[in-house]
């Protein structure tokens, strides 16, 4: 009832009528509601909304005066049935007294504004506020510095396999030089023996020829110088020139061998 009730009752007798809640098939039910807190900005001239959900859950939405923030208040609670409680309703305009049976008692508490009701539709009709620019997300925290990890140590390789030392090469060079020296010495010795044989053979031929001349008769006239025996001079020339060339090569090879040995000793 939104009308102003007269707190004073007259002392006259009135007819009391039982309301519809006392019928076998009641067409109406009455409830009592208790609020823990009701804001002063609630508009009492507007209708509210009451919703009953599962498990006797009750949601009540009451509008506020236009321009208030928030535009409504939502209450939530539970209902409990009454056993033998009634309420007296007095209509001061008609002077009628009606007694109604109470069905349940509802106790609610104030919550935040929400709900899908007529009041919510009224709110949607109001101009929407421009959306506020969203703030950029905060930068990620700096990552801690980590020292670079060392690669795992691989199998160690011996330096001799990767970089072979020059000592084996020097040994090979020494062997080659010594082999050449031996070959040259053999050649020189063989050439010397052949030259001595040729000289001895030429001497024996001269002796035999001279003795034969004495036995047979007078000696033949001397031949010109260019018709001297063929084997005497080339044999001497070959015997003298060849040892000289081989001795020079021997000296060169020996010097190289000494230098290589001295170089290997200095490296050691």
From Swiss-Prot:
<keyword id="KW-0010">Activator</keyword>
<dbReference type="Pfam" id="PF09816">
    <property type="entry name" value="EAF"/>
</dbReference>
<comment type="function">
    <text>Acts as a transcriptional transactivator of ELL and ELL2 elongation activities.</text>
</comment>
<dbReference type="GO" id="GO:0006368">
    <property type="term" value="P:transcription elongation by RNA polymerase II"/>
</dbReference>
<dbReference type="GO" id="GO:0015030">
    <property type="term" value="C:Cajal body"/>
</dbReference>
<feature type="compositionally biased region" description="Low complexity">
    <location>
        <begin position="188"/>
        <end position="203"/>
    </location>
</feature>
<dbReference type="GO" id="GO:0008023">
    <property type="term" value="C:transcription elongation factor complex"/>
</dbReference>
<feature type="compositionally biased region" description="Basic and acidic residues">
    <location>
        <begin position="171"/>
        <end position="181"/>
    </location>
</feature>
<keyword id="KW-0805">Transcription regulation</keyword>
<dbReference type="GO" id="GO:0045944">
    <property type="term" value="P:positive regulation of transcription by RNA polymerase II"/>
</dbReference>
<feature type="modified residue" description="Phosphoserine">
    <location>
        <position position="165"/>
    </location>
</feature>
<keyword id="KW-0804">Transcription</keyword>
<dbReference type="GO" id="GO:0016607">
    <property type="term" value="C:nuclear speck"/>
</dbReference>
<comment type="similarity">
    <text>Belongs to the EAF family.</text>
</comment>
<feature type="compositionally biased region" description="Pro residues">
    <location>
        <begin position="128"/>
        <end position="154"/>
    </location>
</feature>
<dbReference type="GO" id="GO:0045171">
    <property type="term" value="C:intercellular bridge"/>
</dbReference>
<dbReference type="InterPro" id="IPR027093">
    <property type="entry name" value="EAF_fam"/>
</dbReference>
<dbReference type="InterPro" id="IPR019194">
    <property type="entry name" value="Tscrpt_elong_fac_Eaf_N"/>
</dbReference>
<dbReference type="GO" id="GO:0005634">
    <property type="term" value="C:nucleus"/>
</dbReference>
<protein>
    <recommendedName>
        <fullName>ELL-associated factor 1</fullName>
    </recommendedName>
</protein>
<dbReference type="GO" id="GO:0034243">
    <property type="term" value="P:regulation of transcription elongation by RNA polymerase II"/>
</dbReference>
<keyword id="KW-0539">Nucleus</keyword>
<feature type="region of interest" description="Necessary for transactivation activity">
    <location>
        <begin position="182"/>
        <end position="262"/>
    </location>
</feature>
<comment type="subunit">
    <text>Component of the super elongation complex (SEC), at least composed of EAF1, EAF2, CDK9, MLLT3/AF9, AFF (AFF1 or AFF4), the P-TEFb complex and ELL (ELL, ELL2 or ELL3). Interacts with ELL and ELL2.</text>
</comment>
<feature type="region of interest" description="Disordered">
    <location>
        <begin position="106"/>
        <end position="268"/>
    </location>
</feature>
<feature type="compositionally biased region" description="Polar residues">
    <location>
        <begin position="238"/>
        <end position="268"/>
    </location>
</feature>
<dbReference type="GO" id="GO:0003711">
    <property type="term" value="F:transcription elongation factor activity"/>
</dbReference>
<keyword id="KW-0597">Phosphoprotein</keyword>
<dbReference type="GO" id="GO:0032783">
    <property type="term" value="C:super elongation complex"/>
</dbReference>
């Amino acid at each position: 009832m939104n009308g102003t009730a007269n707190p004073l009752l007259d002392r006259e007798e009135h007819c009391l009528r039982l309301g519809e809640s006392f019928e076998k098939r009641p067409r109406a039910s009455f409830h009592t509601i208790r609020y823990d807190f009701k804001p002063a900005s609630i508009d009492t001239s507007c209708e509210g909304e009451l919703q009953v959900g599962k498990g006797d859950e009750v949601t009540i939405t009451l509008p506020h005066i236009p321009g208030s923030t928030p535009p409504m208040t939502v209450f939530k609670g539970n209902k409990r049935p009454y056993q033998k409680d009634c309420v007296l309703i007095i209509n001061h305009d008609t002077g009628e007294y009606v007694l109604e049976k109470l069905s349940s008692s509802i106790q609610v508490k104030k919550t935040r504004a929400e709900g899908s009701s007529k009041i919510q539709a009224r709110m949607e009709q109001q101009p929407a506020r421009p959306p506020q620019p969203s703030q950029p997300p905060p930068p990620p925290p700096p990552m801690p510095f980590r020292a670079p990890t060392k690669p795992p140590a691989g199998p160690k390789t011996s330096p001799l396999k990767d970089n072979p030392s020059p000592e084996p090469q020097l040994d090979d060079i020494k062997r080659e030089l010594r082999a050449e020296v031996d070959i040259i010495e053999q050649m020189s010795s063989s050439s010397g023996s052949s030259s001595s044989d040729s000289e001895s053979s030429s001497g024996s031929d001269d002796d035999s020829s001279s003795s034969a001349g004495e036995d047979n008769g007078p000696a033949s006239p001397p031949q010109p110088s260019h018709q001297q025996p063929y084997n005497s001079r080339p044999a001497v020339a070959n015997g003298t020139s060849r040892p000289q060339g081989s001795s020079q090569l021997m000296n060169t090879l020996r010097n190289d061998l000494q230098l290589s040995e001295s170089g290997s000793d200095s490296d050691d």
